[in-house]
Amino acid sequence: MAEEKQHHRLFHHKNREEEGGPVDHKKKVKHHSHLQKIGELGAVAAGAYALHEKHKAKKDPENAHKHKIKQEIAAVAAVGAGGFAFHEHHQKKEAKKEKKAAEKGRHH
């Protein structure tokens, strides 16, 4: 009987936005700005690694195919990270609009 009553609270966490409480718009803007920077850094790092592998493919003709595959994977990762940064940029702009609308409604 005790085993049946035992509940794990794995999926019972509430999201702050779902609670209906006040949303901290400044924190939301900062969060999306931070994620945008991470996306940009990821794109730069993956692009640098792709260039590194391109150089390795030229210098090591014996394993050139392996290096070209790694280069292509890094290039795809760079494009994905750039897309993520672009997405977060738009999320940040949306959060700024929400912040401005909330401030406008507050300061009659």
Curated annotation (Swiss-Prot):
Basic and acidic residues biased stretches: 15-24, 95-108
> Which stretches of sequence are listed as region Disordered?
1-34, 84-108
Looking up InterPro entries in the UniProt record yields:
ABA_WDS
Q: Biased-composition ranges for Basic residues?
A: 25-34
Family from the record? Belongs to the abscisic acid and water stress-induced protein family.
The name of this protein is Abscisic stress-ripening protein 3
Point out the gene that encodes the protein. ASR3
